Amino acid sequence: MGLKDFVDKLKNIKKSRIKIEEGAWIKCDKCKNILYIEDLLKNLKICPHCGYTFRMNAKERVDSLLDKVYSYDLFPKIKPVDIIGFKDTKRYKDRLKEAQEKTGLNDAIIIAHGNIYDREVVLASMDFNFMGGSMGSVVGAKFVRGVEFAIEKSIPFISVAASGGARMQESIVSLMQMAKTAIAIDRLNKAGILYISVLTDPTMGGVSASFAFLGDIIIAEPESLIGFAGPRVIEQTIRQQLPEGFQRAEFLLEKGQIDMVVDRKNLKKTIYTLIRHTHG
């Protein structure tokens, strides 16, 4: 082997190591420690040093809560359509394609069916990685069908919100989903079916103003940003500085807007206990 070939080989080895290292480690946003991703996943994406909770995708959330999964998505054939031919800096069609390739999902929600320990449930899990978890026609349609499935089987319905709000690319159609999901929850209530709403970071806009705050029991993960408009928008509007921790889960608990703040490690057990005590 010549000197040039040897040097090229060393460069290739170095490049492959860099790729492996870049994909294997992540920095904690809070304490800035470097974490091994495999260990982080085993710890429910909670930093072992400071307890900071990284955002989970929809499937990770299902895996963290359900012991047995009958279906990760009961309605996989429902797909988004560019109803109004929306275009900003990109066409909506292109944004959808990019999000689908990035996440492997059709849209920002999956409706899972499975067991938490020995209790059968329906779990609506949102994915912030899909266009900011924005709610459009598909999110609304799948959510409603999930509720109908829970009513049909007389089993608890759980939603895990992670969203920036309504999807602007669908205009008024996205806003319609607020009423649509709220009406579905009303049917769930009339059927006497338990609805537990879990709010994660972030739960904002049209999602917070609809199904996310309609739970019989509302749980939030620690330090989650929860509200309608963001804090910067509010400060600019009222021209006042907001209180420390405003719109964080602990602040909302103190003001009586949610029922409890539960650490991710205790979330499954807490939900199970609530189901046992309220759903027979």
Swiss-Prot record:
Gene Ontology terms: cellular component: acetyl-CoA carboxylase complex
Oligomeric form and interacting partners: Acetyl-CoA carboxylase is a heterohexamer composed of biotin carboxyl carrier protein (AccB), biotin carboxylase (AccC) and two subunits each of ACCase subunit alpha (AccA) and ACCase subunit beta (AccD).
Pfam families: Carboxyl_trans (PF01039), Zn_ribbon_ACC (PF17848)
Lineage: Bacteria, Pseudomonadati, Aquificota, Aquificia, Aquificales
Obligatory cofactor(s): Zn(2+)
InterPro entries attached to this UniProt entry: AcCoA_carboxyl_beta, Acetyl_CoA_COase_Trfase_b_su, ClpP/crotonase-like_dom_sf, COA_CT_N, Znf-ACC
UniProt: Zn(2+) binding residues: 28, 31, 47, 50
Keyword Zinc: yes
Origin superkingdom: Bacteria
First and last residues of each zinc finger (C4-type): 28-50
Top class in the EC scheme: transferase
Name of the protein described by the UniProt record: Acetyl-coenzyme A carboxylase carboxyl transferase subunit beta
Function: Component of the acetyl coenzyme A carboxylase (ACC) complex. Biotin carboxylase (BC) catalyzes the carboxylation of biotin on its carrier protein (BCCP) and then the CO(2) group is transferred by the transcarboxylase to acetyl-CoA to form malonyl-CoA.
Primary subcellular site in the record, as a coarse category: cytoplasm
Catalytic activity: N(6)-carboxybiotinyl-L-lysyl-[protein] + acetyl-CoA = N(6)-biotinyl-L-lysyl-[protein] + malonyl-CoA
Species for this entry: Sulfurihydrogenibium sp. (strain YO3AOP1)
Assigned protein family: Belongs to the AccD/PCCB family.
Subcellular location(s) of the protein: Cytoplasm
EC number(s) per entry: 2.1.3.15
